[in-house]
Amino acid sequence: MAEKRNIFLVGPMGAGKSTIGRHLAQMLHLEFHDSDQEIEQRTGADIAWVFDVEGEEGFRRREAQVIADLSEKQGIVLATGGGSVQSKDIRNHLSARGIVVYLETTIDKQVARTQRDKRRPLLQVDDPREVLENLAEIRNPLYEEIADVIVKTDDQSAKIVANQIIEQLGF
């Protein structure tokens, strides 16, 4: 890989963006960033707190700034938040500044992977499956719109998925 290209991971919560991203960055000797972790570092608070205090709109503003800043770097793997693609500006940033990989997963897998995770504010409801289905209806077409590569993450280890991404990208 002569030039340092950015790889941006998009997909729903529970698709494995952070875990796969760490493996991918390590395998390609790139820097790894997670937009949610970056927001937590910058605010000194967890995502749930940001949602509680600033609402989803405040969180999305912070997320847009973090992604704009990080996507300026060269040679990174960035795991984005599941809802980040709802912003046209973010979609444009990602498409223009790197390779976008959509990590696709089923609602069943999302439910299984997120059911005990209290750090996901949008899922702290009586019926998280319904929330995930509604989000998928809105977001999946946006993931597909900007994806250079689509990789299914169901029933595969993060390492195998990272290898599939490398293979598909020809690195």
Swiss-Prot record:
Pathway in which the depicted protein is active: Metabolic intermediate biosynthesis; chorismate biosynthesis; chorismate from D-erythrose 4-phosphate and phosphoenolpyruvate: step 5/7
Keyword Metal-binding: yes
GO cellular component: cytosol
Record: residues binding substrate: D36, R60, G82, R139
Domain of life, per lineage: Bacteria
Catalytic reaction equation(s): shikimate + ATP = 3-phosphoshikimate + ADP + H(+)
KW tRNA-binding (keyword) present: no
Cofactor annotation comment: Binds 1 Mg(2+) ion per subunit.
Residues at which Mg(2+) binds: S18
The protein's required cofactors: Mg(2+)
Molecular function, one GO term: ATP binding
Class of the enzyme per the UniProt entry, highest EC level: transferase
SUPFAM superfamilies: P-loop containing nucleoside triphosphate hydrolases
Coiled-coil ranges per UniProt: none
GO BP field: amino acid biosynthetic process; aromatic amino acid family biosynthetic process; chorismate biosynthetic process
Principal place of residence: cytoplasm
Location relative to the cell: Cytoplasm
Chain residues that bind ATP: G14, A15, G16, K17, S18, T19, R120, Q156
Function, in words: Catalyzes the specific phosphorylation of the 3-hydroxyl group of shikimic acid using ATP as a cosubstrate.
Assembly notes: Monomer.
NCBIfam families reported in the protein's UniProt record: PRK05057.1
Protein name from the UniProt record: Shikimate kinase
Species whose genome carries this gene: Shewanella baltica (strain OS155 / ATCC BAA-1091)
Gene from which this protein is expressed: aroK
